[in-house]
Curated annotation (Swiss-Prot):
Any GO CC annotation of this UniProt entry: ribosome
Database matches in PANTHER family: 39S RIBOSOMAL PROTEIN L20
Family annotation (InterPro entries): Ribosomal_bL20 (IPR005813), RIBOSOMAL_L20_CS (IPR049946), Ribosomal_protein_bL20_C (IPR035566)
Family: Belongs to the bacterial ribosomal protein bL20 family.
CDD domains: Ribosomal_L20 (cd07026)
Listed name of the protein: Large ribosomal subunit protein bL20
Matches recorded under NCBIfam families: rplT_bact
GO molecular function: rRNA binding; structural constituent of ribosome
Domain of life: Bacteria
GO biological process, one term: ribosomal large subunit assembly
Gene that encodes the chain: rplT
C-alpha cells in the first residue's frame, strides 16, 4: 500500500484559515493555531450578534418612540396601549421612523391614542 502524504491538503486547509484571519491583530493573522482559534471565535460572535442585532434595534426603536411619545404627553406604554385600543397596527420600526422623520404624522397617531385613552 502506498504511503499517503497530506502536504497539499494540509497546506490548503491552513491557507484557508489564514485567509479568513486576514486583518486580525498581532499573531492572530500569522500563526495557524492562534488564527484558527480566532476564526472559530469570530464565527461564534457573528452567529451570536446576528441575534443580538435584532434585540438592539428593537431597544433603539422603543427608546425613540418613548422620547417622541413624551413630547406628546404620553409614556411609551400608554401610547402603545392607546394605539391598540384605536386598532392602529403600526410596528415599532415604522413608529420610530415616523418619530424621527415625520413628527406631524407621529403626533396624529399620538392624538388618536390619547382619544381612545380618554386623555
Amino acid at each position: 500500500m502506498a504511503r499517503v502524504k497530506g502536504g497539499v491538503v494540509s497546506r490548503k486547509r491552513r491557507k484557508r484559515v489564514l485567509k479568513l484571519a486576514k486583518g486580525y491583530y498581532g499573531a492572530k493573522h500569522i500563526l495557524f493555531r492562534t488564527a484558527k482559534e480566532q476564526v472559530m471565535n469570530s464565527y461564534y460572535y457573528a452567529y451570536r450578534d446576528r441575534r443580538q442585532k435584532k434585540r438592539d434595534f428593537r431597544k433603539l426603536w422603543i427608546t425613540r418612540i418613548n422620547a417622541a411619545a413624551r413630547l406628546n404627553g404620553l409614556s411609551y406604554s400608554q401610547l402603545m396601549h392607546g394605539l391598540k385600543l384605536a386598532e392602529i397596527e403600526v410596528n415599532r420600526k415604522m413608529l420610530a421612523d415616523l418619530a424621527v422623520n415625520d413628527a406631524a404624522a407621529f403626533t396624529a397617531l399620538a392624538d388618536a391614542a390619547k382619544a381612545k385613552l380618554g386623555k
